[in-house]
Amino acid sequence: MAKQIIVLGATGDIGSQALELLRYSFDYELVGVAFKSNYSAFEKNLPYFDKLNYIVIENKEAADEFISHHSAFAKNVFSGENGIEKLLSYYPKATILNAISGNDGIIPTLLALENDQDLLLANKESYVVGSSLMKEKMKTYKGHVYPIDSEHVGLSKCLRFVSKHYKDNEFRRMTITASGGALRDLPLEKVAEAKKEDVLKHPTWKMSNKITVDCATLVNKGYEVIEASEMFSVPVDMIEAVICRDSLVHAGVYFTDWKKGERLACYEYSPCDMKVAISFALSKGKLRMHICNIDDYEDVNRHVKEFVPIDKKRYPLFYLTKKCFAKYGNEGMFYYNAVDTKAIEAFLADEIKFFEIQKALEYVVDNMPRLEKLSENNLKKFISSSEIYATELLNKKSWRLL
């Protein structure tokens, strides 16, 4: 019997690819979706999902326009901030795929965990800003979290393989990889003034503009180290990130096999395609792994030998991101991520230069507002106040002169 699934962030990069996979799935039936406003990007999916009952469109005007084109959904389209909560309450047994971007994604993450629902999680901010709340929920409720991120899927596969085949092992450390982004070969003296069209030319992945900029600064890789630390309960200093130019080796686990007294490593090697990670999450970790042949082993070894440390001069924001989390925890990351998002929006709108993304983030780390302890009671306050802070900061001129 097909399992019910709800896709949140259905018109974004991950959500759209998930729907492409679900069109031909015998394992799932799509019963609900949610997105902000871009209904025209979603309409092409309607013929494929005859069990789709409810649609959440956050923007009221866009919701009304959608209904005017699709009157059959007139009573089944919700808008406003409570729409997702209503949708999840209608299907308490459904699997939830959360591909919402930004700080807002933490709310449906917590709702799904509260409902004991399995959560396929592409919203990395949930761990970055809300890991303390997630851990509390996971102590009480029975839902499972399956990551949708090539690095964390890779780590999951490696850890599973090591625990299955090396019973007497001692974990040493983890590695996740980065491509280095679009500016990795640009002379260092030219990076600060990099143009939008150059920053958006990702060398290996096809992603949203926001994530592509985060790849150029490696803010996203800082987030992924934090996410891995919180997800697998491993200290940040035991997780390294390195440059793998082809993005074919996504992650690795280093361990000691005490049975043979050897230090070994297990790497995950797969194409640069987010559908690999999405498929693994949809299978809830049961998707069979590719069995390597001799050519694969040689290729992996070649890539591993070509790993390069992350240069602090070229990628200072990778280190600043980790510093912010170490200093301010989840609470400070609300503000850091909100400023990063607003700064990228300003850069893409040609309102600030590339190097000013770094200046804005340095400013928030050095001028963090007074932080109260994060709780469910003040969660929405954190989201709104960090949004206001970021908007006001980007409208100021003073920080740009620092």
Please tell me what each predicted stretch does.
Residues 1-402:
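Catalytic, metal-anchored helix/loop core of enzyme active sites in primary metabolism
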